Amino acid sequence: MKRIAIISPSGKFYGSEQVLFDFLCTTQHKYVIYVPEGTFYDKIKNQGVHTPHLFTSVKKLYLHLAWMLLCGEFDGIYINEGGHIKYLNLLASLFPNKNFYVHIRLLEDCSAARLRKMHKNVSYISISDYITTEVKQNTGIQCYTMYDIYKLSSGIAGIKEFRIENDIVRLGIVGRLTTTKGLYDISHFCNYCENNQTKVHLEFHFFGGIDNHISEVKDFVVKAGTYKNINCKFHGFVNDKKQIY
């Protein structure tokens, strides 16, 4: 097995960290994980299976990783979000025989300005077909959609007919309410549902922090309170997915 170091730029325990932690809880392999101090580090340490290393300086971290790659300690590096792409691209240039992987999560990471030059030894992955398409359209770079372990639908024919049995349809939207996480599309969809009344009543349940300091976010929350045909409920960040259900 190739020795892949894992980098988590955030030490918090939000969506991408929860997905990564679920993987770490189910994999049969052991990994070295570099992560800032925080909840995520504590969870990995308490799990007692993998080896977490704290870092406080991004530049020092990548100098250390360069040395580890040079010494042959790692065969590659996986980064759990796109914020460190420029550092990873530098390592990819210095070590063309090593493999590098980036999990693209946000729209802001799909731009040509962020991804820059494509390297043959860098692979971009996502768990969203929407993000995958954005990367391809904006940069021409191939991005691969990885279907997560919870979905058995990969390779299985989809449902041919979809019927709604209840008068109320509840839609859960998980993630921080902000402009980089699809606020524009959410707002337009809510407006469409409000202006095109259907036989069923729609409830939108938002689970995640709200960036009220951003004017577009604040305006949407205010407008959501004026809807008559749909109902929007903001629950804030939840610590456990069981709370959602």
Task: Give the predicted meaning of each segment.
Residues Y14-D22, T178-N195:
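A conserved mid-protein helix/loop that constitutes part of the nucleotide-sugar donor-binding site
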Residues A5-I7, R163-K181, S187-C190, F204-H205:
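Conserved donor-binding/catalytic core segment of Leloir-type glycosyltransferases
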Residues M1-R3, A157-R170, E194-K199:
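Nucleotide-sugar donor-binding and catalytic loop/hinge architecture
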Residues S93-L94, F100-I104, E108-D129, K136-Q137:
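A conserved, positively charged/aromatic
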Residues Y78-Y87, I104-R105:
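Short His-centered aromatic/hydrophobic patch
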Residues N121-A157:
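Donor nucleotide-sugar binding/catalytic pocket of nucleotide-sugar-dependent glycosyltransferases
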Residues T56-K60, N231-Y245:
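Conserved active-site histidine-acidic residue motif and adjacent donor-binding/catalytic loop
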Residues Y34-T39, V174, L202-K218, F234:
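Glycosyltransferase donor-sugar binding loop
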